[in-house]
Amino acid sequence: MRLNTLSPAEGSKKAGKRLGRGIGSGLGKTGGRGHKGQKSRSGGGVRRGFEGGQMPLYRRLPKFGFTSRKAAITAEIRLSDLAKVEGGVVDLNTLKAANIIGIQIEFAKVILAGEVTTPVTVRGLRVTKGARAAIEAAGGKIEE
């Protein structure tokens, strides 16, 4: 065993820094912050995205677009999800009961993704052309 081969015990944790506990600790007086300047002050430091006074990137670039509020309450339903609904009738309430869509959803559209094997009746939902053809080919029907 030599001094250069010593290491802490497995799973041990290094003690945290104790600031301002005298000059001999190495972290007294200025507490590791150096002398003066913005970063030495309480609450000192610059905000995220600050570029030293230069016009920051997020302000140099133009604004564009918006976030649709309707998108948060709209869902897409795959054809393969229709089989998870019990009873053969698919509408917003049965989709919510089967945990396919969230309770906040107000609009839904069935899309051609996956496949439908059992005949189902889709009621009160929008349906794409491809999904409509697949549902009718499986013996199901769409009611507006």
UniProtKB/Swiss-Prot annotation:
Sorted UniProt keywords: Ribonucleoprotein, Ribosomal protein, RNA-binding, rRNA-binding
Disordered: region residues: 1-54
Gly residues bias locations: 21-31
A single MF term (Gene Ontology): structural constituent of ribosome
This protein's record includes keyword GTP-binding: no
SUPFAM superfamilies: Ribosomal proteins L15p and L18e (SSF52080)
GO biological process, one term: cytoplasmic translation
A Pfam family that the UniProt record links to this protein: Ribosomal_L27A
InterPro entries hit by this protein: Ribosomal_uL15, Ribosomal_uL15/eL18, Ribosomal_uL15/eL18_sf, Ribosomal_uL15_bac-type, Ribosomal_uL15_CS
Superkingdom to which the source organism belongs: Bacteria
CC per GO annotation: cytoplasm; cytosolic large ribosomal subunit
PANTHER family referenced in this protein's UniProt entry, alphabetically: 50S RIBOSOMAL PROTEIN L15, LARGE RIBOSOMAL SUBUNIT PROTEIN UL15M
Annotated family: Belongs to the universal ribosomal protein uL15 family.
Subunit details: Part of the 50S ribosomal subunit. Contacts the 5S rRNA.
Described purpose of this protein according to its UniProt entry: This protein binds the 5S rRNA. It is required for the late stages of subunit assembly, and is essential for 5S rRNA assembly onto the ribosome.
Name assigned to this protein: Large ribosomal subunit protein uL15
Organism name: Escherichia coli (strain K12)
Highest classification ranks of the organism: Bacteria, Pseudomonadati, Pseudomonadota, Gammaproteobacteria, Enterobacterales
Originating gene: rplO
